[in-house]
Structures are given as structure tokens and as C-alpha cells.
Amino acid sequence: MTQNVVIIDTGCANISSVKFAIERLGYAVTISRDPQVVLAADKLFLPGVGTASEAMKNLTERDLIELVKRVEKPLLGICLGMQLLGKLSEEKGQKADEIVQCLGLVDGEVRLLQTGDLPLPHMGWNTVQVKEGHPLFNGIEPDAYFYFVHSFAMPVGDYTIAQCEYGQPFSAAIQAGNYYGVQFHPERSSKAGARLIQNFLEL
């Protein structure tokens, strides 16, 4: 079956790398913020880099907030895109001094990682502990490494389908209904990341 794959055009910097990662798997992909295109998609990606406050501002200016909430097909938020699915974020610019209201599609609140002596941001390769049998991680080795770059994270909760440890446990992957999210960058995570993208496209 031919999949209608759409990356929601959030205006963020990593859209092209996500697009290339999907195309490498043999799928055609469209980048769009047109409601007709977005709502007709079989699978959607919500990429994000930068701060939550800037990203929510971009979504507001592009009339994307209500559109994302209307999506009924599987949507995968990547990195900041995952965090935006939560209720709120502490991330405003360089300082956690104001709460940013997010999309409220997942019952999680994004907070600054408490890492003790470990440096922030959490940057580099790390393993994740997956909820057994979740289809997003089909065929991925339990000790597979994924690439992370972040200082804020969603805590572990009922929505967590994989968690990671960096000073504290946090959600590495989440699901709430048709909304999925990964804190790591699958498009930069070699074979394991490519397999995860393929698994999502085959859901």
C-alpha cells in the first residue's frame, strides 16, 4: 500500500534530514502546513529543534495548533516535537523561568533534566528500555543506541513506551492514542533509527 506521508512544516531546522531519512526507506514524503494535505496523510511527522517557546510561537503563527489536534492518523513527534505533545514545558529561551503551554495531547510536563554531575545538554548516544512488545521498536535490538541532544525531558508516566537514564529516568518514547513521540533523533540514529521510522510508517 502506498503511504501518504507528510512532515508538518513547523519551520524548524531538521525537517530536511527527517525527509531524507524517510526517502531512504523508499517512501515519498511531502512537507506541508496545508490543512487539506495534513488531514489527508496516512502518517505524519512533527519535527522540532530549538526551544519550546519559539516552537509554540511558530505553530501559532502558522495556524498549526488546532490542525495538529485534529489529526486522527498516527503522528510522530521528534525531539522537541515530542515535548510539544505534552501539557507544558519549562523551556523558555536559555532559562527555565516561565511555563510554556504546549499542545496538551499527552499528559506529561516537560522539565529541566536533573543530572547531578553529568553535563547538560544530554548529547550523544544512549540506550533505552522499551515497554515489551511495542510495535514502534519491532526488530530493534534491546541494547541499540539512539542519538540524543536535549536538556529538557518528559518524566516517565503511563504514556511512556521507552525510557532512558541520564542522571534521572525520563521518557525516550511516548504514545497517547494516535500520537507518538521520541526524544532522540531517529534520523541521526543509524540502523536502529531507520528501523524505528520504518516501524512507524508500517503501523
Swiss-Prot record:
Q: Which UniProt keywords apply?
A: Amino-acid biosynthesis, Cytoplasm, Glutamine amidotransferase, Histidine biosynthesis, Hydrolase, Lyase
Its Enzyme Commission number(s) read 4.3.2.10, 3.5.1.2
Q: Where is it localised?
A: Cytoplasm
A single GO BP term for this record reads: L-histidine biosynthetic process
One Pfam match: GATase
Q: Which reaction does it catalyse?
A: 5-[(5-phospho-1-deoxy-D-ribulos-1-ylimino)methylamino]-1-(5-phospho-beta-D-ribosyl)imidazole-4-carboxamide + L-glutamine = D-erythro-1-(imidazol-4-yl)glycerol 3-phosphate + 5-amino-1-(5-phospho-beta-D-ribosyl)imidazole-4-carboxamide + L-glutamate + H(+); L-glutamine + H2O = L-glutamate + NH4(+)
Q: Which pathway is recorded for this entry?
A: Amino-acid biosynthesis; L-histidine biosynthesis; L-histidine from 5-phospho-alpha-D-ribose 1-diphosphate: step 5/9
Q: One MF term from GO for this chain?
A: glutaminase activity
Q: Does the keyword Cytoplasm feature in the UniProt annotation?
A: yes
Q: State the active site.
A: C79 (nucleophile), H185, E187
Gene Ontology cellular component terms for the protein in this record: cytoplasm
Functional description taken from the UniProt entry: IGPS catalyzes the conversion of PRFAR and glutamine to IGP, AICAR and glutamate. The HisH subunit catalyzes the hydrolysis of glutamine to glutamate and ammonia as part of the synthesis of IGP and AICAR. The resulting ammonia molecule is channeled to the active site of HisF.
| PANTHER family the UniProt entry points to | IMIDAZOLE GLYCEROL PHOSPHATE SYNTHASE SUBUNIT HISH
Family annotation (NCBIfam families)? IMP_synth_hisH
Q: How does it assemble?
A: Heterodimer of HisH and HisF.
* Record-given protein name: Imidazole glycerol phosphate synthase subunit HisH
Organism this protein belongs to = Vibrio cholerae serotype O1 (strain ATCC 39315 / El Tor Inaba N16961)
